[in-house]
Amino acid sequence: SFSCLAAIAGEVSFKITKQYLNFPISHKENRGRMTFEVNGKPDLSVVIRLAPDEAEYWVFKDVSAFKGKTIKITYDGNEKGLSKIYQSDEIEGQAELYKEKNRPQFHFTTRRGWINDPNGLIYYEGEYHLFYQHNPFERDWENMHWGHAVSKDLIHWTELPDALYPDHLGTMFSGSAV
């Protein structure tokens, strides 16, 4: 259900009541800068191809840590897509995840977005940990986060929340130090 507090040109605000914000993506659009503020404090800034009309696919941001707070999103791209962002306790298209045509079934893939460069491959307390570069906001290179997944057998993987996010110093590339 759509639960938006306010939408004006280039920005929209949500009082967070659900786990995810879902975003429509179209590669016909140029990337625009999207900035998230939580209760007036900067949280994240990414570039994204927000679909003003029909989405080619959807991406999401887990906002469960912000329940009860207000998130303001500003966007300098085609602002028509802002009205299509919505909250839900499910990822848009969740029923079809891992069933998509051409989706690898043996190797790890993320639910949404682009992945590259496995990093920090470790075995710890009975689980294999895979960290990798991740753009959770589209299927091309950009917005470097470090994704995280775990497995007990190196075949069946559970995707965890991203471990590292872009911050005021920049994005999280391979070779970044913590």
Region spans (language model):
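Bacterial N-terminal signal peptides
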Residues: 1-3
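Carbohydrate-active catalytic/glycan-binding domains of CAZyme proteins
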Residues: 8-178
